Amino acid sequence: MIKFHVTIAAVLQLCFLSVCAQAADAPPPDAFRVMPPMAAEKPTITPYLKYQTEMAWHEDDLRRASWEGIRTEADLLNMQRELLKRLLKMIGGLPIEKTPLNARVTGRIRMQGFHIEKLIFESLPGIYVAALVYVPDDAGKHPAVLVPSGHSTNGKAYYQALCQRLVQRGYVVISWDAFGQGERSQFWDEKNHKSRYNLICAEHAILGNLAYLAGTNLARWEIWDGIRAVDYLLTRDDVDPERINITGTSGGGFQTTLIAAVDSRIKVVAPSCYITALAMRVYNRIFKDPDSDPEQDLDGMILNGLDHPGLLLLMYPRPVFVSAAVLDFFPIEGTQQTVHEVERVYEKFGHADRIGMHAGYHGHQFSDENQEAAINFLDHFNGMPRQRSLPEVKQLDDQTLQCTRTGQVMLEYPNARSLMDVIRDYFEEHKTGPATTLKQIYYSKSYPGINSWRVSEYQGAAPGHNEILWEQMGSTRSGDVSIDRYLLHHSRYLAMPLLHIHKSSSDQRRVLLWLGESGKVRESDWSDVRKYLDAGYDIVSIDPRGLGETRMPYKAASPDDPLLGQMDFDRAYVSPISGVLADYVYNSVLTGRPYLLQMIEDVEIARRFAAEKMNRNSEFEVTGTGDAATLSRAVAETLPNIKLLPQPDAHVVKWSDLVEQKQELWPIEYLLPGGAYIH
């Protein structure tokens, strides 16, 4: 027994000495740093954000050029048809069948001159919508207004003042909770009486990210709720079917715009605090509004000409009134630019009076002055008597306005279905379609042609769009190992840190592309790196755009996501609910080249450099640690002459599994629209 203890002690001592020797052998941290240390944590316009913004403006330039071909009204109507076709494709189409609404009124509230009906209807079987219908007391047919809820924890109750003002002006008004808000939480924690996330944007992030993978968008079902709300209004004897209108603010402004774009039964459209120019939104969202809201970022939206001018063009020749806020996080300059552009089209064909705008000097809200301007516009085009002031409102508490006994439709109705189930079913219905591969997607029309880019030494000038300029940033020798540091300048704005780690021997060795979940090799990875070096590999390792040394030195902050503020910098940066990396990803979706494809581009750029500068034209291998195993597998499936060297504990994201298992949280950098269909 004594001998056994001695043997164990000796082994432990040897292991300890081995670990200490490896730690002592590790180069200093500066050996792995290519660029100067980042400035103190602060909002920063990074090269990658600049790159994304310029891409968005370039694509919008192409859209504006296409509008120059609108010479006749027939040209305009042809473009409308094409844009609508693209929009429907982006959201994955609409449900084919209008199933029974099964509408029921669960209660009534008497008010001065009107009453409020508490309504439940099913937009799809088992998808329950909680709505309030504000009805004037006077008999006869009335114009109607849809008021989709913006982002608020209490949903429709938050917008009751607008609804009361409209009903007192003579409109029948229907306002409903969006998915993930008010009485329609999809992730309700019954024990703690709250959402597992939050009822402002977080549930939208969970739903919307999964919908992307299934080749659709959360907007599909938000639009469908609105279409079915119109269907409901048309069942009422007190509604004039020729005078259906819509207005809403923030997320309700988004729904207002998209519902009206798709449903021509809506005659007058008045979005608030939504319309801008998306390239400006790309530029400021991280700093002003970092919460994830995927329904507003349709796949290829800017690329396909459906920036906000394109959406408004779908309204023509219907009257449109845009309410805006000068201090909004939807940039007012973009609002003015978009409205003026669409205004010129309306003027060109004799409808200048059908488009208007009002901006209040305040933050993100449907202020009283904006409401008054919008309601006056609605009155004019609905033949309502002109009034000069807003009527008073009586604020009711949330519980009074609840349509359900329990406060949540998912608790109230045993057959209620979660939208996560519906998204999974959508995928199951569509997965038998034509197969596609990641390689086909990567080399699609948006591929920048890296395989033909020129590689040369950096001389101080910005790189062109089709060249890789390498800059030597230093070298560190540690025993028999050298770490050469490079900065690869490319794509006009971007600079990618790269490490070439190799033994001093001049022998030709295999090249391993080493990918870490946070970027390139770090000091803490040295023991693993040493094993690969001893096994006959040279290592090339990079920081993909937006990661590692190219991270933005900023921790996004949002009053709508208090959990974000409680996270440390590293966790907050990659949060899929709200954060810098998530916004980078959504920006890439808008411009039609998802972030995952851009990370593969970075690996291809590194490979081109290694082949040309280091004269390594043989087959490469690639490996990834942690979540980067997904990227390494994607690289091996996509780029020629790169073989996967799997890690034994690798965790590879499989998009179809995420959808089928209704996974709520997963690494946001691997968001790939339609990824679940890749074979």
Language-model-derived ranges and their functions:
Residues 138, 192-249, 559-626:
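Gly/Ser-rich "nucleophile elbow"/oxyanion-hole loop immediately N-terminal to the catalytic nucleophile
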Residues 152, 178-183, 206, 276, ...:
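Alpha/beta-hydrolase active-site loop signature
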Residues 158-174, 183, 524-541:
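Short amphipathic alpha-helix adjacent to the substrate-entry channel of hydrolases
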Residues 7-18:
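Bacterial N-terminal signal peptides
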Residues 24-128, 308-310, 316-512, 517-538, ...:
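Alpha/beta-hydrolase-fold serine-hydrolase catalytic core, especially in secreted/extracellular enzymes
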Residues 133-135, 141-150, 508-517:
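Short beta-strand element of the alpha/beta-hydrolase
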Residues 228-303, 606-673:
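Primarily recognizes the serine-hydrolase "nucleophile elbow" in alpha/beta-hydrolase
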Residues 152-162, 178, 189-190, 517-530, ...:
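The serine-hydrolase catalytic nucleophile loop
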